[in-house]
Amino acid sequence: MARMKLNARMSTGGKAPRKQLAYKAVRKAAPPTIGVKLPNSYRPGDQTVCKPAPPTDGVKEPHRYRPGKMGLREIRKYKKNARFFISKLPFHRLVRKITQNLKAHLRFQSTAMPAPEEVSEAYLVKLFEDAIHAKRVTLVPKDIQLARCIGGVLA
């Protein structure tokens, strides 16, 4: 069967808007409702009372994640990279302050500082891993004390 040639039509910019049904127009014009469901058989003559939405003044509420989700996300993030969690300069100041109490005028080479940093960080990470149990989101001091007792270091 041979194809017929069609004449090109001039575009009008889309379809003409369809007429809305009365109940749809009323539903769109009504203020937004909270917690009140409109019945399926809504008719314009019905006397349904809808609560108006509280004024938000254009301020959007921040998104909240479930408890513990952000913590697990941070754990995964920090497991991927190989840098220290403890800031370098505050840790170096703390080490110098502690060593000044033991022996005055003690100096450190810059290459010697990563060693105590790595050891202390490994100890803290292990302690926190042991302290997290029972699917808790918050670490409680008694959990850390228990982890220290089990690990061999007295509280």
UniProtKB/Swiss-Prot annotation:
Pollen specific. GO terms for molecular function: DNA binding; protein heterodimerization activity; structural constituent of chromatin. It is found in: Nucleus; Chromosome. SUPFAM superfamilies: Histone-fold. Pfam families: Histone. SMART domains: H3. GO terms for cellular component: nucleosome; nucleus. Its main location: nucleus. Residues 34-59 are annotated as: Disordered. Keywords: Chromosome, DNA-binding, Nucleosome core, Nucleus. InterPro entries: Histone-fold (IPR009072), Histone_H2A/H2B/H3 (IPR007125), Histone_H3/CENP-A (IPR000164). The nucleosome is a histone octamer containing two molecules each of H2A, H2B, H3 and H4 assembled in one H3-H4 heterotetramer and two H2A-H2B heterodimers. The octamer wraps approximately 147 bp of DNA. Belongs to the histone H3 family. Core component of nucleosome. Nucleosomes wrap and compact DNA into chromatin, limiting DNA accessibility to the cellular machineries which require DNA as a template. Histones thereby play a central role in transcription regulation, DNA repair, DNA replication and chromosomal stability. DNA accessibility is regulated via a complex set of post-translational modifications of histones, also called histone code, and nucleosome remodeling. PANTHER family: HISTONE H3 (PTHR11426). This is Histone H3-like 3.
